[in-house]
């Protein structure tokens, strides 16, 4: 009987110790939120600023960030999300490289009871599969670019020939920025997009595609519309190498408003940039903490943004954070 009593005592002590350890583990997990984030890559100045904002905000708010760079490949993002599910992170967030093809992996996250937040770009999947989307209104960005072009040529009567450097094929910003721009210029038949091709949001590809436009096009090119600043900066080099003056012989409108664009505007080589704010880190981390606390977040969080013509570039340059 005494031996049995001692055994029961040992078991009780062991159980109590296990309970304490489990409690500590839960407290540690609750004290430090774990966020799995899949980034598209590092294809532009904008993306670099976006990544820095996310990492900085996570550190400031004490969130354990598990970061994965997809190198602009959807299959890498899907692998990363599945890895986050296996790790049982508290929240998953990602900037989708393209709009389609996410349903299966998002359903897997939902089945694991791990909420998902989309940043920068959205998807075409069932909205019930993600908690919310934080990012810009890409259609409106395209409209702003279109309005600037229409206003610039409002007093003329000649046709306005436009070449377009699109973003990554299938990416939300590329689809929406094209849609918004075309929506505005469609009202006036003078404005014609005579060539349009993907520059994949990169400086190198932007230069390459612009070189091809300049060699193949016999008509005068009046405007270059680039879906981001990096492609525009690459195209500027191609225009100069072709013996033309960017910003004068060919007017250039682009999107993002990174420092490189302001430098190009100050140099007179880029006419206007439409802001797309990459500093989404604080909003993302706030949303993550809200979700973990059991509070809902808005399904759509839109970032406010401005238009910066070259005439205002100098006065805004010093205050730019990216």
Annotated model-derived regions:
Residues 165-173, 184-185, 276-322:
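Hinge/cleft segment of the Venus flytrap/periplasmic-binding protein
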Residues 46-61, 141-148, 172-191, 205, ...:
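Short, solvent-exposed amphipathic alpha-helices that sit
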Residues 100-140, 151, 161, 258-266, ...:
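Flexible loop/hinge segments that line or gate small-molecule binding clefts
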Residues 34-61, 65-83, 87-89, 95-99, ...:
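Extracytoplasmic "Venus flytrap"
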Residues 1-34, 59, 64, 104-114, ...:
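Short, low-complexity disordered leader/linker segments with a strong preference
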Residues 67-69, 125-150, 164-165, 196, ...:
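Short beta-strand elements at the ligand-binding edges of bilobed clamshell
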Residues 29, 35, 77, 134-159, ...:
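Hydrophobic alpha-helical segments within soluble ligand-binding/sensing domains
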Residues 94-111, 181, 195, 199-263:
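Hydrophobic alpha-helical
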